[in-house]
Amino acid sequence: MGLVNGRASLTFLLAALTIIAMVVEARFVVEKESISVLNPEEMRSKHDGSIANFGLPDYGGFLIGSVVYPDSKTDGCSAFGKTFKPKFPRPTILLLDRGGCYFALKAWHAQQAGAAAVLVADNVDEPLLTMDSPEESKDADGFIEKLTIPSVLIDKSFGDDLRQGFQKGKNIVIKLDWRESVPHPDKRVEYELWTNSNDECGARCDEQMDFVKNFKGHAQILEKGGYTAFTPHYITWFCPFQFINSPHCKSQCINHGRYCAPDPEDNFREGYEGKDVVLENLRQLCVHRVANESSRPWVWWDYVTDFHSRCSMKEKKYSIDCAESVIKSLNLPIEKIKKCIGDPEADTENQVLRTEQVSQIGRGNRGDVTILPTLVINNAQYRGRLERTAVLKAICAGFNETSEPAICLNTGLETNECLENNGGCWQDTKANITACQDTFRGRLCECPVVKGVQYKGDGYTSCTPYGPARCTMNNGGCWSDTRNGLTFSACSDSVSTGCKCPEGFQGDGLTCEDINECKERSVCQCSGCRCKNSWGGYKCSCSGDRLYINDQDTCIERYGSKTAWWLTFLILAIVAVAGLAGYIFYKYRFRSYMDSEIMTIMSQYMPLESQRAREVPSEAEPFTL
């Protein structure tokens, strides 16, 4: 009965997917890398290759190796039983024919034979397609998770050229380049993971959950630092209208058949139902939304890992109560999350899940999301196994040059190209300044900013400081020298650039030499003048006991100078005496004038003795009428 139910479930899903395919035109985008033929010269060319969806592509890096085509077992469908070694000390890139077995099995046999990468040549003329890993089967068990080398599909004509060149004995050297496989427009990477809360879907589900647990630490560091913007997504289907009231639809869907997921155990009679998965997927979406609103989007990683360990299907704990206990333990507002989830029984659209269905459809350069798990970085689908370090490298490849966080420049992820020959960039070994900037995809030769001073130049052969404080940095690249306690410099803070020899020196500013003014007879030309050159200047003197006047370029007598000083002193003394006499005279006259004025004023109010004697008659005089 379980088998019958499983087939019924599969039939239902196929019908639903068929309806969806009729509604929207599905689009699958092939993610590519660059392949360059470096040697021999007559074969030099550039081609595209399709990145396989297994193994570990070297995102942000490149690989240079020699092409080897096997004498037998050219399809790689069985073990080679030997190790391929090129004639030259380079990594082996094994060329294999398409057909006969899984692509991943070819890569596995190539890896066992010592290959660093594998090229699979198409056997028909057609556009490139993506080599995917096989579904769960006995053939796939044991090697899919062990594949570490990158695999690339190339078109038939390019494969024919490589095959013929190798058979003619040519040493074919190619470069596999993944540095531009991930768009890197700015300093923030936006990535999304299409996943599922179901942990009973076999190897695919285990791979997803293992990745989430292992990548959690990296993801939260990047998110907390503001370097990335992560968004989780969940695939949902809808039930065809004619099946809405069927038992299958009711057990696998919510909101009256609008959002569905397959039965976890493929058994409609017992265990968990598809709608349980849809509801938990919705809850995890709402956890991210609510956490993002509180500026803690990284809490989603905590919730998903905690839910898997505490509420797994395998332990029969996959329930709403268990989920809400995890939410409470993470101090998330449970009422907001419930409001976000809404009523799963209502005959209405759920905007969160509706958005997910729309997002499944490809936009721009991104193809439709059709398989789980799918990782999208800067709107480009990641190819390869979901492995912590490999995914981190792909995310790091999405940063613009020089904007990568420190976690991306770890020696375990990339090679610091500035350590060898300074990356071919300009450097000032004396000041320990370099134009080489290590980046995840390589290096940049770019003049630096040191202590607030901007250097300008091409970054390869020259960099010179620019701006007001440029002279503090190695004297602005200009000439400078010190002798006998004197320092002269060709750098001036009053100008933003350039070098100019100071007065007393001549040259281009990078080198300056003392000018011998005495030899050039440009100074000390007066009669009786003597010139003595010095570093950065000169000294003029006069013969005898005369003094040299620099402004007039002349010599004067010292005694004449003393007479002038005595004459000046005498004149000043006379002026001082005259001033003193005037002051004394002025003071005397002013006092006499004041005495007279005071007496006049007082006489008006009280008669003075002399005036009284005239006005009072004498006693001897007779009185007359």
UniProtKB/Swiss-Prot annotation:
Indicate which residues form the motif Tyrosine-based internalization motif: 605-608
Gene3D superfamilies, per the entry: 3.50.30.30, Laminin
Q: Which Pfam families match?
A: cEGF, PA, VSR_TRX
Biological process (GO), any one: protein transport
Q: Which GO terms describe its cellular component?
A: Golgi membrane
Lumenal topological domain: 27-564
| Ranges for domain PA | 58-166
Which family does the UniProt entry place this protein in?
Belongs to the VSR (BP-80) family.
What does the UniProt record say this protein does?
Vacuolar-sorting receptor (VSR) involved in clathrin-coated vesicles sorting from Golgi apparatus to vacuoles.
> Know the name of this protein?
Vacuolar-sorting receptor 7
Its source organism is Arabidopsis thaliana
Q: What is the lineage of its organism?
A: Eukaryota, Viridiplantae, Streptophyta, Embryophyta, Tracheophyta
